[in-house]
């Protein structure tokens, strides 16, 4: 199919504060935690708790964490997402390529409006969540579907996920191999994925199965046996039970069993962000060091050329 400028690819990531300040973080978290896909507590109870308790506490606390990982160009998540979009223009020369965030800026709806204003007739939406979840991908789809209802003349295709896409799996495996070639192999590799409440999975969210599929395929590409890798879930929020095993306590238990050297990669994150750089690369490393063990963080694919090429392939196949 010969794609011209009436075809566009819109990559969508989660979002980020515009600055590592308490005010900016509060604005961002206020939008993020108001999404019923993310927090399903009835608004009558949740909104007062969010605005009177959670945001005043988490705003300053999270701002200090963002400051630790903020780049000169801006938020890592924003910087790398933009670089991916720039790279995609090289692989898709006959497409328009844009990027947006589900929360914060550049806003998803505004990005869609801008593409329509450029006379785009077909848009492929690619949420940068390798593993589908109702809490992430479906939230993007909600916004896109609402926009499509008032813009029926534009054909929109939304990619569900790419948890087992061969090119993506190969790119992740290659990044791990490069790390091993440069630094040597550890005793255990952990695949750490963002967690979500267990009740969400109990209600039918396929996310844990998609994470398991991704981890198993990457491990197979690396010729690892089951004793050489482990899966865990990070970034738990609140007091309810989340997906298990929890990543950090699992590492602690393994360290106490005698394992002293770990590598950790986060295949559920397309680009590095607060959760990978501050929580994992800094936080997990510190707590393991206190237990006499070391952990080396393997960065996300970010704007790795193999990652960009894999995403371009997903977009092209979406219109076949």
UniProtKB/Swiss-Prot annotation:
Molecular-function GO term, any one: metal ion binding
| UniProt key word Iron | yes
Highest taxon in the source lineage: Bacteria
| Keywords for this protein | Cytoplasm, Heme biosynthesis, Iron, Lyase, Metal-binding, Porphyrin biosynthesis
Question: Where in or outside the cell is it found?
Answer: Cytoplasm
The entry assigns this protein to a family as follows: Belongs to the ferrochelatase family.
* General function of this protein: Catalyzes the ferrous insertion into protoporphyrin IX.
Main localization of the protein described in the UniProt heading: cytoplasm
Region forming the signal peptide: none
The catalysed reaction is:
heme b + 2 H(+) = protoporphyrin IX + Fe(2+)
The pathway that the record names for this protein is: Porphyrin-containing compound metabolism; protoheme biosynthesis; protoheme from protoporphyrin-IX: step 1/1
Protein name as catalogued = Ferrochelatase
What are the GO BP annotations of this UniProt entry? Answer: heme biosynthetic process
Listed under GO cellular component are: cytoplasm
């Amino acid at each position: 199919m010969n794609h011209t400028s009436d075809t566009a690819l819109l990559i969508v990531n989660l979002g980020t504060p515009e600055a590592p300040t308490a005010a900016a973080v509060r604005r961002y978290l206020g939008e993020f935690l108001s999404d019923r896909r993310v927090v399903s507590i009835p608004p009558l109870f949740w909104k007062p708790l969010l605005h009177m308790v959670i945001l005043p506490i988490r705003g300053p606390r999270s701002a200090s964490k963002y400051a630790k990982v903020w780049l000169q160009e801006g938020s890592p998540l924003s910087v790398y997402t933009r670089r991916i979009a720039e790279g995609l223009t090289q692989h898709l020369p006959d497409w328009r390529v844009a990027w947006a965030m589900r929360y914060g800026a550049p806003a998803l709806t505004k990005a869609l409006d801008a593409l329509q204003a450029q006379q785009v007739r077909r848009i492929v939406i690619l949420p940068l969540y390798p593993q589908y979840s109702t809490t992430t991908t479906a939230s993007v789809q909600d916004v896109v579907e609402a926009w499509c209802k008032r813009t029926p003349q534009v054909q929109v295709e939304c990619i569900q996920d790419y948890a087992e896409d061969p090119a993506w799996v190969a790119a992740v495996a290659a990044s791990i191999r490069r790390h091993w070639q440069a630094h040597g192999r550890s005793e255990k590799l952990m695949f750490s994925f963002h967690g979500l409440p267990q009740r969400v999975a109990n209600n039918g969210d396929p996310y844990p199965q998609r994470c398991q599929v991704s981890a198993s395929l990457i491990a197979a590409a690396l010729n690892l046996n089951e004793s050489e890798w482990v899966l865990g879930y990070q970034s738990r929020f609140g007091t309810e039970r989340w997906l298990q095993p929890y990543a950090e306590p699992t590492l602690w238990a393994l360290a106490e069993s005698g394992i002293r050297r770990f590598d950790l990669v986060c295949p559920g994150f397309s680009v590095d962000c607060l959760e990978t750089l501050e929580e994992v690369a800094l936080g997990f490393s510190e707590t393991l060091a206190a237990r006499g063990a070391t952990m080396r963080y393997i960065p996300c694919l970010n704007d790795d050329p193999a990652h960009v090429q894999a995403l371009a392939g997903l977009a092209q196949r979406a219109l076949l």
